[in-house]
Amino acid sequence: MVTFVSEMRIPVVIPYKPIQPKTRLSCILTDEEREDFAFMMLRDVVNAVKNAGCSPLILATAPVELDDVPVRILEEGLNETINGFCEGNDEPLAIVMADLALADRSAILTLLTSGGDLAIAPGRGGGTNAIYVRSAKMFQAQYYGMSYEKHVRYGTDAGLMVKIIDSFRLYCDIDEQDDLIEVFIHNTGYSREWLISHGFEIAMKKSRIGVKRPGYE
Protein backbone atom coordinates (compact mmCIF):
# COMPACT_ATOMS: atom_id res chain seq x y z
CA MET A 1 0.00 0.00 0.00
CA VAL A 2 1.23 3.51 -0.83
CA THR A 3 0.56 6.26 1.71
CA PHE A 4 0.06 9.77 0.36
CA VAL A 5 1.20 12.68 2.53
CA SER A 6 -0.85 15.52 1.11
CA GLU A 7 -1.83 17.87 3.99
CA MET A 8 -5.50 17.11 3.33
CA ARG A 9 -5.05 17.73 -0.38
CA ILE A 10 -6.53 15.12 -2.69
CA PRO A 11 -3.75 13.17 -4.42
CA VAL A 12 -4.02 13.03 -8.20
CA VAL A 13 -2.09 10.30 -10.02
CA ILE A 14 -0.99 11.31 -13.54
CA PRO A 15 0.15 8.37 -15.72
CA TYR A 16 2.82 9.55 -18.14
CA LYS A 17 4.93 7.97 -20.89
CA PRO A 18 8.05 10.11 -21.48
CA ILE A 19 9.68 7.89 -24.12
CA GLN A 20 8.09 7.39 -27.55
CA PRO A 21 4.76 9.01 -26.64
CA LYS A 22 2.01 10.08 -29.01
CA THR A 23 3.04 8.00 -32.02
CA ARG A 24 0.00 9.16 -33.98
CA LEU A 25 1.60 12.60 -34.14
CA SER A 26 4.61 11.19 -36.01
CA CYS A 27 3.24 12.63 -39.25
CA ILE A 28 3.97 16.14 -38.03
CA LEU A 29 6.43 15.80 -35.11
CA THR A 30 9.82 14.13 -34.81
CA ASP A 31 10.46 11.62 -32.02
CA GLU A 32 12.17 14.27 -29.90
CA GLU A 33 9.41 16.79 -30.57
CA ARG A 34 6.74 14.30 -29.54
CA GLU A 35 8.54 13.80 -26.24
CA ASP A 36 8.84 17.56 -25.74
CA PHE A 37 5.19 18.19 -26.58
CA ALA A 38 4.02 15.37 -24.30
CA PHE A 39 6.01 16.98 -21.50
CA MET A 40 4.36 20.35 -22.16
CA MET A 41 0.94 18.70 -21.89
CA LEU A 42 2.03 17.07 -18.64
CA ARG A 43 3.04 20.50 -17.31
CA ASP A 44 -0.39 21.89 -18.16
CA VAL A 45 -2.13 18.98 -16.42
CA VAL A 46 0.07 19.36 -13.34
CA ASN A 47 -0.74 23.08 -13.20
CA ALA A 48 -4.47 22.36 -13.44
CA VAL A 49 -4.21 19.85 -10.61
CA LYS A 50 -2.22 22.24 -8.42
CA ASN A 51 -4.58 25.14 -9.15
CA ALA A 52 -7.46 22.93 -7.99
CA GLY A 53 -5.72 22.55 -4.64
CA CYS A 54 -4.64 18.95 -5.19
CA SER A 55 -1.32 17.12 -4.96
CA PRO A 56 -0.04 15.68 -8.25
CA LEU A 57 1.93 12.45 -8.40
CA ILE A 58 3.46 11.54 -11.77
CA LEU A 59 3.37 7.81 -12.51
CA ALA A 60 5.97 7.48 -15.27
CA THR A 61 7.31 4.65 -17.40
CA ALA A 62 10.81 6.21 -17.24
CA PRO A 63 12.55 8.81 -15.04
CA VAL A 64 11.31 12.38 -15.41
CA GLU A 65 11.68 15.59 -13.40
CA LEU A 66 9.13 18.38 -13.11
CA ASP A 67 9.79 20.96 -10.44
CA ASP A 68 8.88 19.57 -7.01
CA VAL A 69 6.29 17.06 -8.24
CA PRO A 70 6.92 13.56 -6.88
CA VAL A 71 7.51 10.85 -9.48
CA ARG A 72 7.00 7.12 -9.12
CA ILE A 73 8.39 4.80 -11.79
CA LEU A 74 5.87 2.33 -13.18
CA GLU A 75 7.37 -1.09 -12.46
CA GLU A 76 4.19 -3.11 -12.98
CA GLY A 77 1.19 -2.63 -15.24
CA LEU A 78 -0.85 0.54 -14.83
CA ASN A 79 -3.83 -1.29 -13.34
CA GLU A 80 -1.69 -3.23 -10.88
CA THR A 81 0.16 -0.12 -9.74
CA ILE A 82 -2.98 1.96 -9.23
CA ASN A 83 -4.67 -0.91 -7.42
CA GLY A 84 -1.66 -1.01 -5.12
CA PHE A 85 -2.24 2.66 -4.32
CA CYS A 86 -5.87 1.90 -3.55
CA GLU A 87 -5.45 -1.19 -1.39
CA GLY A 88 -6.45 -0.41 2.19
CA ASN A 89 -6.50 3.34 1.47
CA ASP A 90 -9.57 5.10 2.92
CA GLU A 91 -8.61 8.48 1.48
CA PRO A 92 -9.93 10.00 -1.77
CA LEU A 93 -7.90 9.57 -4.94
CA ALA A 94 -8.06 10.89 -8.49
CA ILE A 95 -6.41 9.70 -11.69
CA VAL A 96 -6.01 12.14 -14.59
CA MET A 97 -4.30 11.34 -17.90
CA ALA A 98 -1.24 13.38 -18.90
CA ASP A 99 -2.51 14.27 -22.39
CA LEU A 100 -5.50 16.32 -21.24
CA ALA A 101 -3.93 19.58 -22.36
CA LEU A 102 -7.25 21.43 -22.08
CA ALA A 103 -7.78 20.53 -18.43
CA ASP A 104 -7.99 23.49 -16.09
CA ARG A 105 -8.84 24.18 -12.46
CA SER A 106 -12.58 24.25 -13.12
CA ALA A 107 -12.54 20.90 -14.94
CA ILE A 108 -10.59 19.21 -12.15
CA LEU A 109 -12.94 20.63 -9.51
CA THR A 110 -15.94 19.39 -11.51
CA LEU A 111 -14.46 15.89 -11.31
CA LEU A 112 -13.85 16.15 -7.57
CA THR A 113 -17.18 17.65 -6.54
CA SER A 114 -19.72 15.45 -8.33
CA GLY A 115 -21.03 14.08 -5.04
CA GLY A 116 -20.64 10.47 -6.14
CA ASP A 117 -18.56 7.65 -4.72
CA LEU A 118 -16.99 7.24 -8.14
CA ALA A 119 -16.79 9.98 -10.78
CA ILE A 120 -15.71 9.06 -14.30
CA ALA A 121 -14.81 11.36 -17.18
CA PRO A 122 -14.98 9.36 -20.42
CA GLY A 123 -12.61 9.80 -23.32
CA ARG A 124 -13.05 9.23 -27.01
CA GLY A 125 -13.22 5.65 -28.24
CA GLY A 126 -14.43 4.21 -24.96
CA GLY A 127 -11.45 5.23 -22.85
CA THR A 128 -11.33 6.72 -19.37
CA ASN A 129 -9.64 10.12 -19.13
CA ALA A 130 -10.16 10.95 -15.46
CA ILE A 131 -11.49 9.27 -12.34
CA TYR A 132 -12.21 10.35 -8.79
CA VAL A 133 -13.05 7.89 -6.04
CA ARG A 134 -14.23 9.03 -2.60
CA SER A 135 -12.44 6.17 -0.85
CA ALA A 136 -9.60 4.64 -2.83
CA LYS A 137 -10.08 1.16 -1.39
CA MET A 138 -13.49 1.00 -3.12
CA PHE A 139 -11.85 1.17 -6.56
CA GLN A 140 -10.11 -1.24 -8.90
CA ALA A 141 -8.54 0.09 -12.09
CA GLN A 142 -9.83 -1.37 -15.36
CA TYR A 143 -7.73 0.55 -17.91
CA TYR A 144 -7.17 -0.47 -21.54
CA GLY A 145 -9.77 -1.52 -24.05
CA MET A 146 -13.28 -0.26 -23.33
CA SER A 147 -12.17 1.03 -19.95
CA TYR A 148 -15.01 3.52 -19.55
CA GLU A 149 -17.64 0.79 -19.78
CA LYS A 150 -15.60 -1.47 -17.48
CA HIS A 151 -15.19 1.26 -14.86
CA VAL A 152 -18.90 2.09 -14.91
CA ARG A 153 -19.82 -1.58 -14.62
CA TYR A 154 -17.35 -2.10 -11.78
CA GLY A 155 -18.72 0.85 -9.83
CA THR A 156 -22.32 -0.22 -10.38
CA ASP A 157 -21.65 -3.84 -9.42
CA ALA A 158 -19.84 -2.65 -6.28
CA GLY A 159 -22.88 -0.63 -5.22
CA LEU A 160 -21.17 2.72 -5.64
CA MET A 161 -22.91 5.94 -6.61
CA VAL A 162 -21.38 6.47 -10.05
CA LYS A 163 -21.37 9.95 -11.58
CA ILE A 164 -20.46 10.54 -15.22
CA ILE A 165 -18.60 13.81 -15.77
CA ASP A 166 -19.69 15.65 -18.90
CA SER A 167 -16.66 17.86 -19.49
CA PHE A 168 -15.24 18.80 -22.88
CA ARG A 169 -11.91 19.67 -21.29
CA LEU A 170 -11.61 16.23 -19.71
CA TYR A 171 -13.03 14.43 -22.74
CA CYS A 172 -10.60 15.88 -25.29
CA ASP A 173 -7.31 14.02 -25.11
CA ILE A 174 -4.66 15.07 -27.61
CA ASP A 175 -3.62 12.14 -29.78
CA GLU A 176 -3.71 13.14 -33.45
CA GLN A 177 -2.97 16.11 -35.69
CA ASP A 178 -6.64 17.05 -35.94
CA ASP A 179 -6.73 17.39 -32.15
CA LEU A 180 -4.11 20.14 -32.12
CA ILE A 181 -6.60 22.83 -33.13
CA GLU A 182 -8.29 22.34 -29.77
CA VAL A 183 -5.02 23.24 -28.07
CA PHE A 184 -4.83 26.46 -30.09
CA ILE A 185 -8.42 27.40 -29.23
CA HIS A 186 -8.79 26.26 -25.62
CA ASN A 187 -5.31 26.05 -24.07
CA THR A 188 -3.51 29.10 -22.71
CA GLY A 189 -0.50 27.32 -21.26
CA TYR A 190 2.66 25.46 -22.16
CA SER A 191 1.18 23.23 -24.87
CA ARG A 192 -0.11 26.08 -27.01
CA GLU A 193 3.07 28.10 -26.61
CA TRP A 194 5.14 25.09 -27.63
CA LEU A 195 3.12 24.59 -30.81
CA ILE A 196 3.44 28.26 -31.74
CA SER A 197 7.19 28.25 -31.07
CA HIS A 198 7.56 25.28 -33.42
CA GLY A 199 5.83 26.92 -36.35
CA PHE A 200 2.27 25.65 -36.00
CA GLU A 201 -0.52 27.97 -37.03
CA ILE A 202 -4.26 27.87 -37.58
CA ALA A 203 -5.31 27.09 -41.15
CA MET A 204 -8.48 26.39 -43.09
CA LYS A 205 -8.86 22.76 -44.13
CA LYS A 206 -11.77 22.42 -46.52
CA SER A 207 -14.78 23.52 -44.47
CA ARG A 208 -13.08 23.27 -41.06
CA ILE A 209 -10.22 24.95 -39.31
CA GLY A 210 -7.16 22.97 -38.32
CA VAL A 211 -3.46 23.53 -37.86
CA LYS A 212 -0.58 23.47 -40.28
CA ARG A 213 3.18 23.47 -39.99
CA PRO A 214 5.35 24.68 -42.87
CA GLY A 215 7.17 21.77 -44.48
CA TYR A 216 4.70 19.17 -43.21
CA GLU A 217 1.71 19.78 -45.48
From Swiss-Prot:
Keywords: GTP-binding, Nucleotide-binding, Nucleotidyltransferase, Transferase. HAMAP family: CofC. The keyword Transport does not apply. Belongs to the CofC family. InterPro entries: CofC, Nucleotide-diphossugar_trans. Guanylyltransferase that catalyzes the activation of (2S)-2-phospholactate (2-PL) as (2S)-lactyl-2-diphospho-5'-guanosine, via the condensation of 2-PL with GTP. It is involved in the biosynthesis of coenzyme F420, a hydride carrier cofactor. One of its GO terms (biological process) is F420-0 metabolic process. It catalyses: (2S)-2-phospholactate + GTP + H(+) = (2S)-lactyl-2-diphospho-5'-guanosine + diphosphate. One of its GO terms (molecular function) is GTP binding. This is 2-phospho-L-lactate guanylyltransferase. The gene is cofC. It comes from Methanospirillum hungatei JF-1 (strain ATCC 27890 / DSM 864 / NBRC 100397 / JF-1). Homodimer.
